[in-house]
Structure formats: C-alpha cells, structure tokens
Amino acid sequence: MSSNTSAPSLNALAGPLVESLVADAAKLRLIVAQENGARTVDAGANARGSIEAGRRIAEICLGGLGTVTIAPIGPVASWPYTVVVHSADPVLACLGSQYAGWSLADEEGDSGFFALGSGPGRAVAVVEELYKELGYRDNATTTALVLESGSAPPASVVNKVAAATGLAPENVTFIYAPTQSLAGSTQVVARVLEVALHKAHTVGFDLHKILDGIGSAPLSPPHPDFIQAMGRTNDAIIYGGRVQLFVDADDADAKQLAEQIPSTTSADHGAPFAEIFSRVNGDFYKIDGALFSPAEAIVTSVKTGKSFRGGRLEPQLVDASFV
C-alpha cells in the first residue's frame, strides 16, 4: 500500500499486469530470463516483441492507473491507427509512475549502459524530488521498471535499483525494449498524456486541480535507425498528439493552461524531430524543453463547463516523419 492512504498502490495495481505479460510471453514474442539476480523481460532487443506487448507495457508504466488502446481512427487521416491513453488519476499515473525520471547508468563497469527508468518502481525508490511534491511513496514486496534500452541492465544497475527500493533483485522485474522495436515505439507514443502532465507541472499549474485526462497520438511505424525511430515517436506526439484535461479550476486558469501545454509554444517547433536533433548535433540539452508536448490541448473546467483550446495538429509534419 502507499504511504498516502487516500491514494492507491501503483505496484499492487501494476503487479498483475506484469505477471500477465510474463505469462503471455510466447504469444507476445517476448523473452523472459533471470539476469544478474533479477527477472528481465526482453520486449524488442533480441526478442521480436509486438504492438500488443507495447500497449500492455504502457499500462504497466502507468502503474495500473490507466488504459491504453489502439483505435482505428484518429486525427491524422493518413495514419489512422491511434494510441489512446486515459487515466482517472493522471497525475499519479503519469508523473508518479510513467514519467521516465530515474537515470540509471553503469557506474561500476565499462558496459556504457544508460537508460531512463519509468514505471511503478520509481514510486518505491522515490529518489526523485518530484515525489515530495506529489506527497506519495509506495510500499511493495515486488516491483517493476520499464527501460527504453536495447540490453538488459548490468549487475551494477540491478543492485542500485535493489538498494533504492529496499527489495532483493529477484523481486524486481526489468522490462526493456529499444525505441526501434514494435513494443518500444508503441510505449513511447503512449506517453502523449504524460508529456501534457509534465508540461502542466513545468508551468506551475496546481496538479491537485487536474482530475482526469485522455490523450491520443498516431501509432508511429518503427524504424531500424535509432535517430529516425526516436524522431518518429516524438513527432507522433509533438505534431499529431492531442490531449484533453479536466480541471477543477476557473476559466482563466483553464484557458491559460490550454495555451501553455502545446508544442507550438516552443521555438524549435516546425520541423521533424530527427532534423532538429541533427541541427543541435545530437545534444538534447540544446533542444527547447517546451517542444516535448502534445500538438493540441483541450482543457475543460468542471467548475464552469467551458473548454479551451491551444495549439494545432500538423499532419504534414507527421507525414514527413513517418514515410
């Protein structure tokens, strides 16, 4: 259970989803193993993986507090298959679990391993300052982390996570897939709602006023090249993503949030992400952080019933990225 008695346990909700993923490994084309004392699930490195695996991994990332579906219709006509994400507790699901906020690197060996950890394991370790703002900590006997990586974590990373969570390595499951894979690209696009929550947090909106949220973005086709694959998943959200947040706020605050969330607020908006990445010579820190947002936002005030819009879809840029 969580230390906040009014909030659900992310790990209690996500645990059955993890076990179901493992049980269905064969039909989802996954490889389950024991490595460095922990259970690992390869969803796209040496395993072929699948879109369905990516969909289910995204629900694990959300800590069991959200649903992820693939819909046959979407806002970008030429790419109709759409990842739809919904959560009745989007702050905890997206920021408390799905956000890839835990930096994990091999600091003892020479593997060069680095990945950002997302999922309910973050809420057990609470190594990020964000959890002080959320006022949340989860207690669990087993946990899981999702890594955007082409390899399993080395022993030093497994031990680091075990120490931070207070759990033995055998009680931690690492699910990993590179962005180039079917599962990897799907679970990244499923972050369309999460980036809106992150932007709301960045601009200082009161997170307690966000009641519900839904988002969608076109399912990006995978690409064998990492830069192109990363570009496509980002472009799906930046130029094809749409979110609607329901807030307990007055019209002025709702309108301002709708205007602040979209990627159009970024000076880097207007070109495919791979092109932007090349322009800054691969230095993420030179990219305006405001770009990592959905293309369009709708914010509805439950106090007044009025809805406000900001941003715009850019289907031509989605096309330029996906073809």
Curated annotation (Swiss-Prot):
Pfam families: MCH. Pathway: One-carbon metabolism; formaldehyde degradation; formate from formaldehyde (H(4)MPT route): step 3/5. GO terms for biological process: formaldehyde catabolic process; one-carbon metabolic process. Optimum pH is 8.5. GO terms for cellular component: cytoplasm. GO terms for molecular function: methenyltetrahydromethanopterin cyclohydrolase activity. The keyword Acetylation does not apply. It catalyses: 5,10-methenyl-5,6,7,8-tetrahydromethanopterin + H2O = N(5)-formyl-5,6,7,8-tetrahydromethanopterin + H(+). Its EC number is 3.5.4.27. Its main location: cytoplasm. Optimum temperature is 40 degrees Celsius. Keywords: Cytoplasm, Hydrolase, One-carbon metabolism. It is found in: Cytoplasm. Gene3D superfamilies: Methenyltetrahydromethanopterin Cyclohydrolase, Chain A, domain 1 (3.10.340.11), Methenyltetrahydromethanopterin Cyclohydrolase, Chain A, domain 2 (3.30.1030.10). InterPro entries: METHMP_CycHdrlase (IPR003209). The keyword Hydrolase applies. It comes from the Bacteria. Belongs to the MCH family. Catalyzes the hydrolysis of methenyl-H(4)MPT(+) to 5-formyl-H(4)MPT. Requires salt for optimal activity. Homodimer. This is Methenyltetrahydromethanopterin cyclohydrolase.
